[in-house]
From Swiss-Prot:
InterPro entries: DnaJ, DnaJ_C, DnaJ_domain, DnaJ_domain_CS, HSP40/DnaJ_pept-bd, HSP_DnaJ_Cys-rich_dom, HSP_DnaJ_Cys-rich_dom_sf, J_dom_sf. It is found in: Cytoplasm. Keywords: Chaperone, Cytoplasm, DNA replication, Metal-binding, Repeat, Stress response, Zinc, Zinc-finger. Binds 2 Zn(2+) ions per monomer. CXXCXGXG motif repeats lie at residues 144-151, 161-168, 187-194, 201-208. The keyword Zinc applies. It comes from Desulfitobacterium hafniense (strain Y51). SMART domains: DnaJ. Zn(2+) 1 binds at C144, C147, C201, C204. This is Chaperone protein DnaJ. Belongs to the DnaJ family. CDD domains: DnaJ, DnaJ_C, DnaJ_zf. The J domain is necessary and sufficient to stimulate DnaK ATPase activity. Zinc center 1 plays an important role in the autonomous, DnaK-independent chaperone activity of DnaJ. Zinc center 2 is essential for interaction with DnaK and for DnaJ activity. Zn(2+) 2 binds at C161, C164, C187, C190.
Amino acid sequence: MKRDYYEVLGVSKSADEQEIKKAYRKLARQYHPDVNPGDKDAEEKFKEATEAYDVLSDTEKRARYDQMGHSAFDPNQQGFGGFGGDFGGFGDIFDMFFGGGGGGGQRRQGPTRGNDLRYDLTITFEEAAFGTEKEIQVPRQETCTECHGSGSAPGTHPTTCSQCHGTGQVKATQRTPFGAIQTARTCPACNGSGQFISSPCKECSGKGTTRKVKTIKVTVPPGSEDGLNLRFSGNGEAGLRGGPSGDLYVVLNVKAHKFFEREGNDVYCEIPITFVQAALGSELDVPTLDGKVKMKIPEGTQTATVFRLRGHGIPYRRGNGRGDQHVRVVVATPTKLTDRQKELLREFGEVTSDQQQMGKKSFFEKVKENIRDAIDL
C-alpha cells in the first residue's frame, strides 16, 4: 500500500512549494542511486520520494491528490482520474443517447501517442552553473524497422477482428435497478485496434515496436538548478498505429558542492581568517566559480561579516548577467599560544581598561601595535 505523499516527503499538508522542494532535495541527495550504488532499499526510497514530488510540486496534481488521494492517479479508476484515467464510462452513456452505434460500438482505437519517459541526470555544481552537454543512454520502445509499426510480417496485412468486427470494442449488458444498460469495453482480442494480426512480425512479435537503447545528446543550459525538468520533444517511446512519439523529460540532480551553496543565482561561502587579519586588515585569495580572486579585508573586521563579490554568482538562465557571491568571514580564535602571545593578550585587556579610563588611543590602535610586536617574535 502506498504511503501518503506528504508523509513520504516529511512535510505537512499546508507546506508551500519551497518547503516541498527543500524536503525532496534532501531525500534525493540522501537516497540517490549514485550515492548508494547497489542499495535497493535506497533506490526504492528515491523512487518513492520522486513520485511524491512529481505530484505535490504540481498545483493541479496536488489539488486532485488532496481531494481523492492515490486514486486520483490510478488508471483503473473510472471517472475523473489522473495519469491515464479515461472517461470510458461517460463515453458509453453519451454514445447510447447521442448515436455512436449504441454503447460506442462504432468507435475504434486509432493512432496512440507514445509514452513519455523520464531520465534522472546527475551533474556537478559547476556544470549546472555554466551549462554542459551530456550523452545519455535511454532504453525505449521504437517503431519496428521490419514491419514499420504494423505488427504484421512483411508481405502480410492485418485482418478485421472477428470478435469486435473491427469496432475495437465489445458490448455488455448490465442489469441495474433502473433497467438494463448496455455498455462497451475495449475488445480483449485486439486490444481495441479492431484488427487481428494472423502473421505477426518476428522482429517485434506483432507489437509494432521493439526495445532499443537510444543515445541522446542533452544540452544543459547555463544557470540550471537542481530539479529542473528539461523536455525533449519526440524522444520518448514510439506511438502505436501511426501515433506520434512521446517526449523525454530529463530531470537534473545537482551534486552538492563542498565549498559553495546556492540560493537562486547567488552563491554563498564561508572563509576563516585569523585574529591578526581581522584586526590589521588583509587581502585574501577567495575561491570563486571562475577561479581565485583577491578580496580586501578592512581593518577591524568582525566575525560573521559578509562581503559581496558582484558578478561571481550563477549565470541567469534567461537573459544576460550573473548573480553575486557572498563571502562570510569567520574570525578563528587561536587555541595554542606561546607564553609571549599570552602576555600580549593580557596587555590587550589592560589596554581596553586604560582606554575606558584615559580616553587615549583606540582599542584597535593598541591591538594593532601589539600584534605587530607579536609578528616580530
